[in-house]
UniProtKB/Swiss-Prot annotation:
Organismal lineage: Eukaryota, Metazoa, Chordata, Craniata, Vertebrata
Keyword line: Acetylation, Electron transport, Membrane, Mitochondrion, Mitochondrion inner membrane, Respiratory chain, Transport
Protein name: Cytochrome b-c1 complex subunit 1, mitochondrial
GO molecular function: metal ion binding
InterPro entries to which the protein is assigned, alphabetical: Metalloenz_LuxS/M16, Pept_M16_N
């Protein structure tokens, strides 16, 4: 239902985009705008379209992306698996009077697990 309050240009465009007119279906405006933006992108950034096409052609769908996400190891698990109880390498440059003792640093590696 239409009143004077909602009879603006925005309402008209929304009505045109979603409901269409007698001569054009509801998605005609969307298709036209996407074709215009596609032509603009091809003219403005000539290397973008071949790059995008190459990227899309390498994706076989969502399966590889989901598999990659599923195979990631959480950082806490990774560091506890590989860094726990390892001997650290300590290097000092310049005066080393304030550098803690190596055994103290090594014993502190236990606390990095938690």
């Amino acid at each position: 239902y239409e009143t004077e309050k909602n009879n603006g240009a925005g309402y008209f465009l929304e009505h045109l985009a979603f409901k269409g007119t007698k001569n054009r279906p509801g998605n005609a405006l969307e298709k036209h705008l996407s074709s215009v933006s596609r032509v603009y992108e091809e003219d403005a950034v000539p290397g973008l379209t071949p790059c995008r096409n190459a990227l899309v052609s390498h994706l076989d769908g969502t399966t590889p992306v989901c598999e990659d996400i599923g195979r990631r190891i959480p950082l806490a698990e990774w560091e506890s698996r590989y860094f726990y109880d390892q001997c650290p390498a300590v290097a000092g440059y310049g005066p080393i009077e304030q550098l803690p003792d190596y055994n103290r640093i090594r014993s502190g590696m236990f606390w990095l697990r938690f």
